[in-house]
């Protein structure tokens, strides 16, 4: 494969010879051989981890390592049962985490398969349609308007070809292509005799010789650069890391102190003292925490996938929930990405498109010119062509005019294709009133070529300005009678003015409500677009992004600003127009330096660096390139801004539910710690066996914690402000609640322990403490549903998963206490009916006390 530098400089004949190809393309056998040699024509996903590696990474968590060490030491000291239970639980967690990670990757892969491109390729002299991944070096590919370009290559044939290369170069306008050889080294955007993978054809037809595929294309080179970029941690990852470090240090200190007191002050056996310390560690470490968080996040991703948002990484769910700034593209995300005619101007009047009367000759003639002087087609299989031209065709269809019928009746006899220099397009047709040239183009250019008087031109310029201020794109139409069909550029003069047609890409119906929901939630929506400022401002005002007190600026304004100046400037701006990829990165970084979490949307290759810079990169699933999707944390399957807002709502609810689950686990474990410490300081027997605490933490705790993670989502979260960037899970109010609730449950457990000691000795007391702690924690699940009391309210019953978890946990406890073969395994003693009644009363009483405390706290806030 030749280097990309030489390709645009060589003649087509040289390239055919070097690549051993012909204008008739490759044979099927040769194509198969080359595909084997070069590999499939697709971007490699750098760093994709194997299932085994993902599984092994589940054991790298610090809390898991502590548990593994505890299991090993337990085995050394002869406590094989505890070791087996601990290792079984750790393995279950690892399997669960692996499955969820693989499922998330599979969801994205399915999206890629849905949007996989195809190509028309010349094989054995015949044009066949193949999956894009099967195209190889030396193939000849056929292009038409609307086609996605599947590989890099040199043009062989070219008829008025224009390609949208904004995804690769950032150039907002389609690039005109030609066949001329190019001398010297030129930048990517000036290689007019080449086409590039990831771009698409907006106009014309062509054939090209494939010179590079897959990772050897220009897009592939950018994708390779992105592989090594370090990913940011989301707030949840940071919070859990902080939590893990603090908890681990605390556990080690407490266990060491307890071991020292037991051995050196109380003279206990070293092995017994160690087992006691291990029991405390087991009580303190929420073994199910990582799996609970993973499960809740995975449920969040599945819910969001059903709502058109595919999460590439589980933690991005929570990250979206704490976003405070959303930088969104305009076209296709806030708008419909579908140009629509809004107004016409004929006879000196501006007429709404839905109020036109095409029985009037001047309006009918304007519409006919719009249909005939256009290359777009609209049919059952979709729309092909420039968006402005498809809008003209749809206008005709809405009034019963069929473009195919019109073009069949008045065929095109000659044409002057549009180009960006003259900003005009002309076609020749035999119309009822004679041979006619129809011309459309920019208003200012057209006016200079018409027969209008200065006064008439001034009036049309006034109407054009009025329409432009409304964010409309305006085209002018004219005609000229001919004596012969052959035309040249000099004929585009002395035109009879027919009128103006104004169109726009209208906002999505749901955009305004979504923007309003963002603002109510304390999230700042920002529009960043390559479009003109007037157009962007009109859309932004209509949907509520551009409000009094904020402004719209063009990228050139921030070009000369330092990073410090831009950081102070960004709060004033709601719309950025005509921006470059570098501008996007600077805008995102400026908001981040102000302490904000930023979500950024993008679809092109040139958006990928900004998507990486953002805290949450959001790629478009329909129009987005594979490089953009790979750089993003979330992919929208409907390219809709409202989906981002819904994802934010889901993210906030998921975070709130995770916090409930963590509060449930930590307060329950706190109760276990306090009970063990009390027994140690009071010189009492060990209240729990390690297997008791593992049973509680992993069986009767896991289900309620998962159920709390599935609490019904609330719209109320969108009335709250985003959490500060630096706020972790372990806030002072959160820790106070955990400590208070843990103390209440511990008191109930200690009372049960003393009742057991008085009734039947250490074995009965241990069983009483175990059963009371277990049942109290099951009841405690209802306490964690809300910061307000829920007892005797509908909210107590609205989570069927929590009700089911309570029932299952209670049945498991009953089974352990009543099934004789389980008694030695779980180290429990037989209890009388009276003692069982004490357990139920103390456990339910702990819930009532906590509910009363919540009521008092709620009244205090009022």
Explain the meaning of each model-derived region.
Residues 724-743, 763-767:
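Membrane-water interface at loop-to-transmembrane-helix junctions
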Residues 1-719, 729-730, 743, 770, ...:
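Conserved cytosolic headpiece of P-type ATPases
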Residues 700, 745, 767-781:
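Generic alpha-helical transmembrane segments
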Residues 680-689, 753-765:
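Helix-coil boundary and interhelical linker segments in multi-pass alpha-helical membrane proteins
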Residues 784:
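A C-terminal functional module that forms or caps the active site or interfaces directly
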């Amino acid at each position: 494969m030749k280097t990309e530098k030489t390709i645009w400089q060589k003649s087509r004949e040289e390239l055919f010879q070097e690549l051993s190809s012909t204008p008739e393309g490759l044979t099927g056998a040769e194509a198969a051989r080359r595909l084997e040699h070069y590999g499939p024509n697709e971007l490699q996903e750098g760093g994709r981890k194997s299932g085994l590696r993902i599984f092994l990474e589940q054991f790298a968590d610090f809390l898991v390592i502590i548990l593994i060490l505890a299991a090993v030491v337990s085995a050394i000291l002869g406590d094989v049962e505890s070791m087996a239970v601990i290792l079984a639980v750790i393995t279950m967690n690892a399997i669960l985490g692996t499955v969820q990670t693989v499922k998330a990757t599979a969801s994205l892969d399915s999206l890629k398969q849905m949007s996989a491109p195809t190509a028309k390729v010349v094989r054995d002299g015949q044009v066949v349609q193949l999956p894009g991944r099967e195209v190889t070096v030396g193939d000849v590919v056929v292009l038409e308007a609307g086609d996605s370009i599947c590989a890099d290559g040199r043009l062989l044939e070219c008829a008025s070809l224009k390609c949208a290369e904004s995804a690769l170069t950032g150039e907002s306008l389609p690039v005109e292509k030609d066949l001329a050889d190019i001398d010297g080294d030129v930048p990517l955007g000036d290689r007019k005799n080449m086409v590039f993978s990831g771009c698409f054809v907006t106009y014309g037809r062509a054939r090209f010789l494939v010179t590079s595929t897959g990772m050897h294309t220009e897009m592939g080179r950018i994708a390779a650069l992105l592989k090594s970029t370090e990913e940011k941690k989301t707030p949840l990852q940071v919070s859990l890391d902080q939590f893990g470090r603090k908890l681990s240090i605390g556990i080690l200190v407490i266990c060491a102190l307890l071991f020292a007191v037991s051995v050196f002050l109380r003279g206990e056996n070293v092995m017994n003292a160690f087992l006691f310390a291990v029991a405390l560690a087991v009580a303190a470490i929420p073994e199910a925490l990582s799996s609970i968080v993973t499960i809740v996040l995975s449920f969040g991703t599945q819910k969001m996938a059903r709502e058109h948002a595919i999460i590439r990484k589980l933690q991005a769910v929570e990250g979206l929930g704490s976003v405070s700034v959303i930088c969104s593209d305009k076209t296709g995300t806030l708008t419909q990405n579908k140009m629509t005619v809004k107004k016409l101007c004929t006879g000196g009047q501006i007429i709404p498109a839905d109020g036109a009367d095409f029985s009037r000759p001047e309006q009918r003639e304007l519409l006919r010119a719009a249909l005939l002087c256009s290359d777009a087609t609209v049919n059952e299989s979709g729309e092909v062509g420039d968006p402005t031209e498809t809008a003209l065709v749809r206008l005709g269809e809405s009034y019963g005019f069929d473009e195919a019928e019109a073009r069949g009746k008045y065929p095109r006899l000659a044409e002057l294709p549009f180009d960006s220099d003259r900003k005009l397009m002309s076609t020749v047709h035999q119309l009822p009133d004679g041979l006619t040239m129809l011309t459309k183009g920019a208003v200012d250019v057209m006016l200079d070529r018409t027969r209008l008087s200065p006064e008439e031109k001034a009036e049309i310029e006034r109407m054009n300005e009025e329409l432009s201020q409304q964010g409309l794109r305006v085209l002018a139409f004219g005609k000229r009678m001919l004596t012969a069909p052959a035309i040249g550029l000099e004929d585009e003069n002395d035109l009879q003015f027919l009128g103006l047609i104004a169109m726009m890409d209208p906002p999505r119906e749901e955009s305004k409500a979504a923007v309003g929901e963002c603002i109510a939630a304390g999230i700042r929506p920002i529009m960043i677009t390559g479009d003109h400022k007037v157009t962007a401002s009109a859309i932004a005002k209509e949907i509520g992004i551009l409000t009094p007190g904020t402004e719209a600026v063009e990228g050139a304004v921030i070009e000369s600003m330092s990073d410090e100046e831009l950081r102070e400037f960004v709060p004033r701006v709601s719309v950025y127009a005509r921006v470059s990829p570098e501008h996007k990165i600077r805008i995102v970084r400026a908001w981040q330096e102000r302490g904000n979490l930023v979500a950024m949307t993008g679809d092109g290759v040139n958006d990928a660096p900004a998507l990486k810079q953002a805290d949450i990169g959001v790629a478009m699933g329909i129009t987005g390139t594979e490089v953009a999707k790979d750089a993003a944390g979330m992919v929208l399957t409907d390219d809709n801004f409202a989906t981002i807002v819904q994802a934010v709502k889901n993210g906030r609810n998921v975070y709130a539910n995770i916090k409930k689950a963590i509060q449930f686990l930590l307060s329950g474990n706190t109760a276990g710690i306090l009970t063990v410490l009390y027994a140690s300081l009071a010189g009492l027997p060990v209240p729990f066996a390690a297997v008791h605490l593992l049973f509680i933490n992993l069986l009767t705790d896991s289900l309620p914690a998962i159920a709390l993670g599935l609490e019904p989502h609330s719209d109320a979260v969108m009335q709250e402000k985003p959490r500060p960037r630096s706020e972790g899970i372990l806030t002072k109010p959160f820790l106070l609640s955990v400590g208070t609730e843990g103390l209440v449950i511990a008191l109930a457990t200690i009372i049960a322990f003393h009742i057991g000691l008085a009734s039947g000795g250490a074995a009965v007391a241990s069983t009483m403490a175990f059963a009371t702690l277990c049942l109290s924690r099951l009841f405690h699940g209802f306490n964690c549903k809300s910061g307000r009391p829920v007892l005797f309210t509908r909210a107590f019953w609205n989570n069927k998963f929590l009700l089911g978890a309570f029932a299952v946990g209670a049945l498991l406890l009953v089974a352990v206490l009543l099934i004789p073969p389980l008694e030695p395994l779980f180290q429990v003693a037989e209890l009388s009916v009276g003692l069982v009644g004490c357990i139920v009363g103390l456990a339910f009483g702990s819930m009532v006390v906590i509910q009363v405390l919540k009521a008092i706290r709620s009244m205090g806030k009022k």
